[in-house]
Amino acid sequence: MQKLFIVLVLFCILRLDAEVDGLTVSLCNQSECQEKCKKENKNGKCIQEIELNWVYNICKCF
């Protein structure tokens, strides 16, 4: 029962991280990033940033 609870808690934490925009540990889809930035008349690129031993994949518009 404890293992199930731990797995459930970890799943909720990871799901919460994936839903937050900005600096989160997530996958960046290049085509979605370009579409998002095209609306701002900019070029989009997936960038990896490292902060406190975490790697963040985020979309940047240039």
From Swiss-Prot:
Organism: Buthus israelis
Keywords, ordered alphabetically: Disulfide bond, Ion channel impairing toxin, Neurotoxin, Potassium channel impairing toxin, Secreted, Signal, Toxin
Protein name: Potassium channel toxin alpha-KTx Tx790
Tissue expression as described in the entry: Expressed by the venom gland.
Localization (cell): Secreted
Domain notes from UniProt: Has the structural arrangement of an alpha-helix connected to antiparallel beta-sheets by disulfide bonds (CS-alpha/beta).
Family to which the UniProt record says this protein belongs: Belongs to the short scorpion toxin superfamily. Potassium channel inhibitor family. Alpha-KTx 23 subfamily.
GO molecular function, one term: potassium channel regulator activity
GO cellular component terms, A-Z: extracellular region
